[in-house]
């Protein structure tokens, strides 16, 4: 990456926004007021919200099958992988938020400024494909949920899901807090649905807790290792790193004041960690549900429809089987898909503005972002006559794109947050810099392994 000269003055070893470019998510940037000289809890409430938008990326429909299959095949052993993945997510999202708060720019803007035109354009294409891949998984999840709940044909569900971009346009005019509240509500629905279903399943709590302890079999068992890689590889979503660096700037604070910046970093990180803990709980519940209900049944649980049907089949899940369990599962799937499409659309805008500085009306920008994602799904649905199995195969392919794009977001993030020139006194400390690079290298290796295995399975 080339050196980037800036003529803006620094204060308290921080860099102010460089140039006269547009702010990240300009229409909501700095719009949420933070009370001055307030107590801990009141200040925390002011900063609470962005973490929920980040957390939905860690419990989107693309993660569900892997988590439930992990429990169904290996009982509670892979809970330790869920825990480790969540800790990694917390570290990287804290870096992302700190980058946005200190520099006043998002990860996409900084990447564009610190690379040449060709490199920047290539990175934009890769990242745009990742956004499409993310949105594809969420659109498919929502469309299948609408079919399971209301009997809508898949093509109708896809179109309905695609149109929620219009709802987002209205919400943005009402204020960013409204978006945060809606996403938090959808996250709560997911949490309570799976908590209820796990309580009904009555897992052995001793075995559950033991599952969080590291086990050598995770590495020595090939099948277990592959599923572990699936959980870890799908945990850190590229678009969340861009999103986190942008929405951390929605709070209004004095960026020229060191104390205000430090406070923003502190409370944004607390909010992020709380919400990612909830995502950890949801992913744990998914795996626990798979273990408690499906371990030893030899059931085919590779698709959402299979899971939906299994929950109402007493021969598979026993006496607790009921249509209500299936409907609750579909409701949680719809909540996950809808909350994720909101954040995916926002991330798409951040990436389009940040990488290519595209100037167009917001409604057009969001519509283009959504059309780029929904078009492949509609084409697939038409070609395969709405066949759920084929549509879900597209979801699997979409995860490969996410794996490819991950290093192109993670490496710049670690570089930028480790830069004294960019971050001043808020740059990564030595231990976090080393840990960040170790995590980046490990995740890249894991994702390459996943890509090769996925392509081998497809062939």
UniProtKB/Swiss-Prot annotation:
One Pfam family, short name: Nramp
Alphabetized GO MF terms: cadmium ion transmembrane transporter activity; manganese ion transmembrane transporter activity; metal ion binding; symporter activity
Keyword flag Membrane: yes
Membrane topology: Multi-pass membrane protein
Membrane-spanning segments: 38-60, 77-97, 120-140, 152-172, 181-201, 223-243, 276-296, 316-336, 367-387, 396-416, 434-454
Entry GO terms, CC: plasma membrane
Keywords: Cell membrane, Ion transport, Membrane, Symport, Transmembrane, Transmembrane helix, Transport
GO biological process, one term: iron ion transmembrane transport
Top-rank taxon, per record: Bacteria
InterPro entries: NRAMP_fam
Localization, UniProt: Cell membrane
Biased composition (Basic and acidic residues): 1-15
Region (Disordered): 1-27
UniProt keyword Membrane, yes or no: yes
Recorded family membership: Belongs to the NRAMP family.
Record's function text: H(+)-stimulated, divalent metal cation uptake system.
PANTHER family in the record: NATURAL RESISTANCE-ASSOCIATED MACROPHAGE PROTEIN 2, SOLUTE CARRIER PROTEIN FAMILY 11 MEMBER
Listed name of the protein: Divalent metal cation transporter MntH
Lineage per the UniProt record: Bacteria, Bacillati, Bacillota, Bacilli, Lactobacillales
């Amino acid at each position: 990456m080339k050196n980037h000269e800036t003529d803006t003055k620094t204060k308290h070893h921080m860099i102010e926004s460089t140039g006269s470019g547009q702010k990240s998510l300009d229409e909501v940037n700095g719009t949420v007021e933070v009370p001055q000289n307030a107590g801990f809890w009141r200040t925390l409430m002011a900063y609470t919200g962005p973490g929920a938008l980040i957390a939905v990326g860690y419990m989107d429909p693309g993660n569900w099958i892997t988590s439930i299959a992990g429990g169904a095949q290996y009982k509670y052993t892979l809970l330790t992988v869920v825990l480790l993945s969540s800790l990694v997510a917390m570290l990287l999202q804290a870096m992302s938020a700190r980058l946005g708060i200190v520099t006043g720019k998002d990860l996409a803007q900084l990447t564009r400024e610190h690379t040449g035109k060709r490199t920047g354009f290539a990175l934009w294409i890769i990242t745009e494909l990742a956004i499409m891949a993310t949105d594809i998984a969420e659109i498919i999840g929502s469309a299948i949920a609408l079919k399971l709940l209301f009997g809508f044909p898949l093509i109708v569900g896809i179109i309905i899901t695609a149109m929620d971009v219009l709802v987002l346009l209205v919400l943005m005019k009402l204020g960013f807090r409204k978006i945060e509240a809606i996403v938090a509500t959808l996250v709560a629905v997911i949490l309570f649905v799976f908590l209820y279903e796990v309580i009904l399943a009555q897992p052995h709590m001793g075995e559950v807790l033991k599952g969080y302890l590291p086990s050598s079999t995770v590495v020595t068992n090939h099948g277990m290792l592959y599923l572990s890689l699936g959980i870890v590889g799908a945990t850190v979503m590229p678009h969340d790193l861009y999103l986190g660096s942008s929405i951390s700037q929605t709070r209004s604070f004095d960026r020229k004041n060191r104390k205000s910046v430090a406070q923003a970093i502190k409370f944004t990180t607390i909010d992020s960690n709380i919400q990612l803990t909830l995502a950890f709980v949801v992913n744990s519940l998914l795996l626990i549900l798979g273990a408690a209900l499906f371990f030893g049944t030899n059931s085919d649980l590779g698709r959402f429809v299979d899971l939906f049907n299994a929950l109402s089949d007493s021969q598979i899940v026993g006496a607790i089987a009921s249509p209500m369990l299936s409907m609750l599962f579909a409701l949680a799937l719809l909540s996950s898909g809808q909350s994720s499409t909101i954040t995916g659309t926002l991330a798409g805008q951040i990436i389009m503005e940040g990488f290519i500085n595209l100037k167009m009306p917001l409604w057009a920008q969001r519509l283009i972002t959504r059309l780029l994602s929904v078009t492949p799904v509609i084409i697939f649905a038409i070609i395969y006559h709405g066949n759920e199995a084929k549509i879900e195969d597209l979801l699997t392919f979409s995860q490969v794109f996410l794996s490819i794009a991950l290093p192109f977001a993670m490496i710049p993030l670690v570089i930028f947050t480790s830069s004294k020139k960019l971050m001043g006194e808020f740059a990564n400390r030595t231990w976090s810099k080393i840990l960040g690079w170790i995590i980046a290298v490990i995740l890249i290796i894991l994702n390459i392994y996943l890509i090769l295995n996925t392509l081998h399975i497809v062939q």
